[in-house]
Amino acid sequence: MKLIYTDDHREHAGAKEMRYDQMIPMSESPERMDLVIQGLADAGFQDIVKPDVFPDDHIHAIHDPGFVRFLEVAYSLWKKEFGPGGFATAYTFGMRGMDQVPNESVHSMLSCYTFDVCVPIVAGTWKAVRSAVDVALTGSAAITAGERAVFSLCRPPGHHASGDLAGGYCYLNNAAIAAQFYLNAGIDRIAILDVDYHHGNGTQRIFYERNDVLYLSLHARPEDEYPFLMGYAQETGACEGENYNVNLPMPLATAWHDYREALQHAISRLQAYRPDVLIVSLGVDTYKDDPVGGFALESEDYLRIGELISLAGLPTHFILEGGYAMAALGRNVGNVITGFEK
C-alpha cells in the first residue's frame, strides 16, 4: 500500500492545550507521525510517496473562503499584536444572539472560526494544514487512477473541522475534501467510515443534508465524551441527507466484543449502500491506554479492525485522524493496515 507523506507537518508544533483544569503540551504532536511511520515500517509498509500540490479550489469546495483565509493569516495578525513566538488562540467564542460576522481583528476571527481551545495556531500551522490537504488529495488521485488502497498520513487531523469552524486539533477536513474530489471526478457514491474514538462532528456537519456521501461513525457516546453536543444515534441526516448519517455511539470502557458488533453493523450498511470508494477516517485513540480516550481495545484488536474493513471489498482510502498513546500508536496503526492487507 502506498503511503502519502510530507515532512511539512512538523511546522505545526510547540503549542499547548487546555485539558480541563490544566495547561499541557499538545497531545497532537509531530512525534505522533514519527511513531506512525516507524510502526508502518515495522509492519512492512515503506512505499512512501510525496504529495502533489493541488489548487485551492478543492478546499473551497468544502470550506468557506473567509475561514480558509483566517487560517492562512491568523498567526501573522497575532504576531503583529503580541510579537513572534507563542500561539494564537481564542478568548471568546461566537454565541447565539451575537454578531458572528468577523472583522479584521484576529480576536474576532478566532472567536468566529474556532469552537474550542484545542486549535492553537503557530507560525507553521498553515503550511502543515495546507500540506495535509495535498496529502489527502494525492491519495484520492491515486485511487481515482486505479489504486485499490492508499494511506494518506495527514497531520493535523481533520474530522472535527466543519465548513467554517476549526476545533479538536482539526483545521481543514481532509476526509471531506478527499470525498469531494472523488465526486468531482465523476465517482458518484462515496462512503466515509470514521473509527476515531471521538465523533467526527465536522464531517457530519459538512454532509448532513447531502445524499452523495454516506457517513458512518463509531465513537464514544457524546454524553460522556468530546465533542459532547453531536454524535447521537438519532442524528440520521436531514433534507436530502436523511438516512445518510449513521452514528454508532458506545459507552466508556467498550472492549472488542461490543466494538466488533458496531463495526460489523457499519460494514453491513456499507455493503448495502455499495459505494464506489470507501474513505476511512482512521483514529486509534480507541486503544485502552490512550490519554484522551476511554475505550478498552487491545493492540491485537486493530488487526481485526483492518480485516473487517477489508471485507467491504472496496477501493479504500485511509486518512489518519487521532491516536495519542505514544507507546502503542505505531503498532496499532500498523496492525490496522496489516489486517486490511491480509
Show which residues each predicted segment covers.
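HDAC/HDAC-like amidohydrolase catalytic core signature
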Residues: M1-L193, H198-K342
